Amino acid sequence: ILVTPDIISRVVEKSFEFKCAAVGVPVKDTIKIIDMNSFIESTPNRSSLWAVQTPQVFEKKVYMNALENAKKLKQNYTDDCQLIENNGGKVYILKGDYTNIKLTTVDDVEYAKMMFENRGVNRWG
């Protein structure tokens, strides 16, 4: 399914309320922080961990200011929420759906293809 019209509407609505909003889901897996030698250092409390998804919606002024600061500092971020938070902003997270996957890696694309094929939808290629 990926992103739904309902998710898009809800995140846009929250962005008007909070200036910055994104979609996410609670993490189901146990997450480990490991050291450089691949040994576990700690286990964060899963109840506070969320996998952030898209869409991520921001007030233009807030986003552009954060982007300018990142350029000046030559910083790179894995998503736009990190860009905002590292520039002092707060991003409201609302619950999305586990089928709303990010297409970041080749494996993600293959998984999405499988999801569509299992639902009888085939628009690839």
Describe each model-derived feature in a short phrase.
Residues 1-2, 100:
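A short, conserved beta-strand element in the Rossmann-like catalytic core
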Residues 2-94, 125:
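Conserved core of the sugar-phosphate nucleotidyltransferase
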